[in-house]
Structures are given as structure tokens and as C-alpha cells.
Amino acid sequence: MARAKRGVIARARHKKILKQAKGYYGARSRVYRVAFQAVIKAGQYAYRDRRQKKRQFRQLWIARINAAARQNGMSYSRFINGLRKASIEIDRKILADIAVFDKAAFAALVEKAKGALA
């Protein structure tokens, strides 16, 4: 019978994958072959979702700004256009925060945007 010269290396690789798969359900955390596939797939999802997270947060901010702008009688696109014309440079993340936590300040921004459009 031939010698197994990479037993230590193989075990180390298997241990590494099984450690990464810790917490997965059933065979995905116990059987190397299944765990390997699960870890690879998890990596693909993580890679994809790191990019999607940026899109999703921007989407959320725009939805919040739109809702707050409409409460003050203005659409999102007209509000953003008004801010540009008034040369107010606040990014959407901060605008969304203001819309949620400081309604008076947001109303003041809407008035400035309306003034710039008029």
C-alpha cells in the first residue's frame, strides 16, 4: 500500500473548512464534502451582498427622503433638484437621518429647496 504523504496537510485543510462551516445545519457543518460546497456558496453570497448592501442602503435613504419630502408637499426629485439649485450639498445618508430624527430641520431644507425652484 502506498504511503499517504499529505495526511497532515489534508487534515489541516479539512479542519479549516469545517471550522468555517461551524454553525451550519446538519451535514453542512459535519461532512467535509458538503461543508466545502456550503462555505464556497457562502463566500459567493457574501461577495455579492457586499456590493448589494451599498445599493440597498441608497434605496432605503431615497425612500425615507421621498416620504419625508412628500409630507412637506414636495416630491423627491423636485426636492433634490431644489437642493442642487440652492447649492446645498448634503448626501442622501445625512438627509435620510435628518428626515427621520429632525423633522423641523428637514422642513427647513424643503423650504429652501422650494425657494430655489421658484
UniProtKB/Swiss-Prot annotation:
Its job: Binds directly to 23S ribosomal RNA and is necessary for the in vitro assembly process of the 50S ribosomal subunit. It is not involved in the protein synthesizing functions of that subunit.
GO term, biological process aspect, one: ribosomal large subunit assembly
CDD domains per record: Ribosomal_L20 (cd07026)
UniProt xrefs under SUPFAM superfamilies: Ribosomal protein L20 (SSF74731)
Protein name listed in UniProt: Large ribosomal subunit protein bL20
GO molecular function, one term: rRNA binding
Any one annotated GO CC term: ribonucleoprotein complex
Pfam family, one: Ribosomal_L20
rRNA-binding listed as a keyword: yes
Keyword annotations from UniProtKB, A to Z: Ribonucleoprotein, Ribosomal protein, RNA-binding, rRNA-binding
Top-level taxon of the source organism: Bacteria
Keyword DNA-binding among record annotations: no
Similarity section: Belongs to the bacterial ribosomal protein bL20 family.
PROSITE patterns per record: RIBOSOMAL_L20 (PS00937)
Gene3D superfamilies referenced in this protein's UniProt entry, alphabetically: 6.10.160.10, Ribosomal protein L20
